[in-house]
C-alpha cells in the first residue's frame, strides 16, 4: 500500500512539474529578412556595396579597354615599326591581360562577397543582440527565425518589439 501511494505521489509530482514547465515556456519568432533591411545601417551598407560594385565594373572596363587597344595595335600594320623583341613583349602583355580579364569575374565576385560580409556582419550582430535583449526583457524562452519554420507551435511575432528596441519605425 505504501509502495502504491509512493508511486502515485511520484507520478503526480512529475505530471505537475511537466505542466508548470509548459506554462513557463514563452515562444516568439522574428524575421531577420524583414528586420535587417529596415535598419539605417543596412541602407548605408547597401549604398556602399553598390558603389563598390560600380568601382569593380569600372576596373573591368578599364582592363578590357587596355586589352582591346594593345590587341588592335598588334593586329594593325603599325607593327612594322617594332622589332621582333618588342612585338614578342607586346604579345606577352596582351596574353597576360587576357588571362587577367578571364579571371576577373571570379576575383571580383570574391572581393564583392568579402566586402558584403565585412559590411553586413556588424548589422546582423546588432540585430541578433537586440533580439536577445527583447527576449530577455519580455521573458521569451525560445526565439525562432520565421524564415526557417515550416510548422511551429503558437508563438508571438517579436518584430515590432525588436524594431522598437532599435528605434526603427
Task: Describe the residue ranges of each PLM region.
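Amphipathic, charged alpha-helical segments and their helix-to-coil junctions
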Residues: 24-169
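Positively charged n-region of N-terminal signal peptides that target proteins for export
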Residues: 1-5
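Sec/Tat signal peptide C-region and signal peptidase I cleavage site
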Residues: 17-23
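Bacterial N-terminal signal peptides
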Residues: 8-16
Amino acid at each position: 500500500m505504501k509502495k502504491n501511494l509512493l508511486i502515485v505521489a511520484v507520478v503526480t509530482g512529475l505530471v505537475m512539474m511537466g505542466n508548470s514547465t509548459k506554462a513557463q515556456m514563452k515562444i516568439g519568432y522574428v524575421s531577420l529578412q524583414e528586420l535587417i533591411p529596415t535598419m539605417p545601417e543596412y541602407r548605408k551598407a547597401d549604398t556602399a556595396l553598390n558603389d563598390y560594385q560600380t568601382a569593380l565594373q569600372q576596373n573591368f572596363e578599364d582592363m578590357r579597354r587596355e586589352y582591346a587597344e594593345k590587341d588592335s595595335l598588334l593586329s594593325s600594320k603599325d607593327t612594322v615599326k617594332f622589332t621582333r623583341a618588342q612585338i614578342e613583349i607586346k604579345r606577352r602583355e596582351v596574353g597576360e591581360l587576357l588571362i587577367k580579364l578571364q579571371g576577373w569575374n571570379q576575383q571580383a565576385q570574391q572581393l564583392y562577397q568579402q566586402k558584403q560580409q565585412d559590411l553586413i556582419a556588424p548589422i546582423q550582430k546588432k540585430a541578433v543582440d537586440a533580439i536577445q535583449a527583447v527576449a530577455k526583457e519580455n521573458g521569451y524562452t525560445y526565439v525562432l527565425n520565421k524564415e526557417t519554420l515550416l510548422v511551429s507551435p503558437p508563438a508571438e511575432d517579436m518584430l515590432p518589439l525588436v524594431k522598437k528596441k532599435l528605434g526603427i519605425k
